[in-house]
């Protein structure tokens, strides 16, 4: 007998939203395990002893991958967000085959997430940057995350919005879905960043 394919929780919930037949329990949960895109070696977190005390050493990449596997197998999340390299590893292991969890890939890495050793990128306005090749990403998953950061600086914000516009055009051509993340500016802009970000998104939602 053929094994019945398990539907993705994300697709089920999105269909409910589209038809208006949703309830409070249908909120979407994504586990962000993409810290290696900017955090480097410390990304998996510190090793802890049995009492929970933090040790000096960091967990390994394999520890990080095992954590993603455990959470995915639990079915407690709808989306597992990963870097392209880790997604390639886990998808090749068949982790998401016949799983209710949808794999998603971080599709850009703006300068404000760069956690380079001795770097000071967090002291500067965020600039758009994208590592991934969209054509190759489609072979892994049709879902990804794109992030933007508003700085209340006309040159920086224009470059960020242009990057998002260009990304959307390319993503559409490859039939890749995405969800959007808006970061707070790493630089103090002197007012509530939430108001700035919300106004930007409403003003540009029909143009980008």
Language model feature labels by segment:
Residues 153-161:
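Active-site glycine- and acidic-residue-rich loops that bind
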């Amino acid at each position: 007998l053929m094994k019945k394919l398990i539907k993705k929780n994300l697709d089920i919930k999105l269909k409910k939203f589209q038809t208006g037949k949703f309830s409070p329990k249908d909120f979407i949960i994504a586990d962000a395990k993409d810290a290696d895109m900017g955090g480097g070696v410390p990304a998996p977190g510190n090793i802890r002893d049995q009492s929970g005390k933090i040790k000096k050493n960091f967990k390994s990449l394999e520890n990080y991958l095992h954590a993603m596997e455990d959470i995915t197998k639990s079915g407690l999340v709808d989306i597992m967000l990963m870097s392209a390299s880790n997604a390639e590893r886990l998808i090749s292991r068949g982790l998401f085959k016949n799983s209710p969890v949808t794999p998603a890939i971080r599709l850009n890495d703006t300068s404000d997430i760069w956690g380079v050793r001795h770097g000071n990128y967090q002291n500067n306005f965020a600039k758009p940057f994208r590592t991934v090749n969209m054509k190759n990403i489609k072979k892994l998953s049709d879902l990804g995350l794109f992030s933007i950061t508003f700085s209340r600086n006309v040159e920086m914000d224009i470059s960020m919005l242009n990057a998002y516009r260009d990304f959307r055009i390319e993503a559409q051509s490859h039939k890749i879905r995405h969800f959007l993340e808006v970061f707070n500016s790493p630089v103090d802009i002197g007012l509530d960043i939430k108001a700035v970000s919300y106004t930007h998104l409403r003003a540009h939602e029909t143009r980008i």
